[in-house]
Structures are given as structure tokens and as C-alpha cells.
Amino acid sequence: MSEPLRVAVLQGGRSLERAVSLRSGAQVRDGLGRLGHTAIPIDAGGELVGELIAAQPDVAFIALHGRHGEDGTIQEVLEALQIPYTGSGPAACVRATDKVLAKHLMRAAGIPTPPFFALHDHVVKQLGGADALPSIEERLGFPMVVKPAHGGSALGVKFARQGSELPGAMVGAFSYDVRLLLERHIA
């Protein structure tokens, strides 16, 4: 085995996926310990940068989920501190965590993806966007998947099997993000 590493395990944070992240962090720490490495748990809160500097890790293992963990934010901080880390770089994270952008990139690359529409809550609440729903329903059909444009762990994902279920599904998705994705369900 190579020399043991000091690994900062970044976990928790302030996203809606905090609980998932804490469980992931515990599993990572256990695995690193079994491999003979020193795991340094760091809850990604208000003192994160100072804690990273003080810990002087050889590498950071990103066990964060959701905003600021998977969206390129923490990766940019680690790069600024010159701390190597697990996972993708900031640009790839930004592309992957924005579901609407990711779908546009897939289409541009010729990768099949179900038909979709994106709506911002401002459009729905203040610009009469709800009037576009019959057209969207006609073009996507039912069942339809309604999900926040950002985030993971299936938080806020709802299925609308018919038109009467769509408003409730949208309210649920909007409780997680200001933008949502309406997508044809593929069985």
C-alpha cells in the first residue's frame, strides 16, 4: 500500500440534501479508515475554508450533495486552495447539475432525451405562464415528470398522470427550486 493520506471528507453542508451527505460522509470515512488513511470530517459550513487550511489535507473527498457540493462551488474553492479533490471539475459540475442545460447539451450532442419544457416560477406566477400548460400538456402528454431544475436525490420529483395533478406537482417542484423541468415520462 502507498503512504497513508490525510483526506478531508467534506460532508453535510447547508443544502436540502444535508442528511444524505452526512450518511455518505460516514460511509466514506469508514472506508478510508479500513484502507489505513486518516479521514478528517469537515462539515461544510461557515468556517469551511479555515477548516480546510487548518487540516492541511493531501486530498479532499467530496461527499456533499446538492447546491454548493455538486454544482462546482466547492470544486472552485478547492482549486483556489490547491487541494486535489475527487470528482469532476467546476465546469462539468455546472453542466451536470443544471438539468435543463444538461438536456440541451445532450440534444446538441445527438444523445436522445425525452421531450421537455422548462418554466421559471416568475413566468408562472407573474407572467401568466400557467396559460401555456395546455400547450405543454398536448406536446408532452401524460404521464409527465415534473422536477426541480437543480438538485438531486429525487427531491421534489413528482409524476403527473393527468392534467389535474400537474399544478400540485409543479408546486412541489417549485418548493425546491425557482425553475422546473416538465418532461415526458418514458416507461
Where are these regions (language model features)?
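Glycine-rich beta-alpha junction loops
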Residues: 123, 150-152, 186-187
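Hydrophobic beta-strand scaffold residues
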Residues: 39, 84-85, 113, 144, ...
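Acidic/histidine-enriched active-site and ligand-binding environments that engage anionic O-linkages
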Residues: 133-144
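Basic phosphate/pyrophosphate-binding loop/patch that engages nucleotide-derived ligands
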Residues: 105-113, 172
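ATP-binding N-terminal substructure of ATP-dependent carboxylate-amine bond-forming enzymes
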Residues: 1-108, 120-134
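Glycine-rich phosphate-binding loop of ATP-grasp-fold ATP-dependent ligases
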Residues: 21, 114-118, 143-169
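Phosphate-binding site of ATP-dependent enzymes
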Residues: 158-187
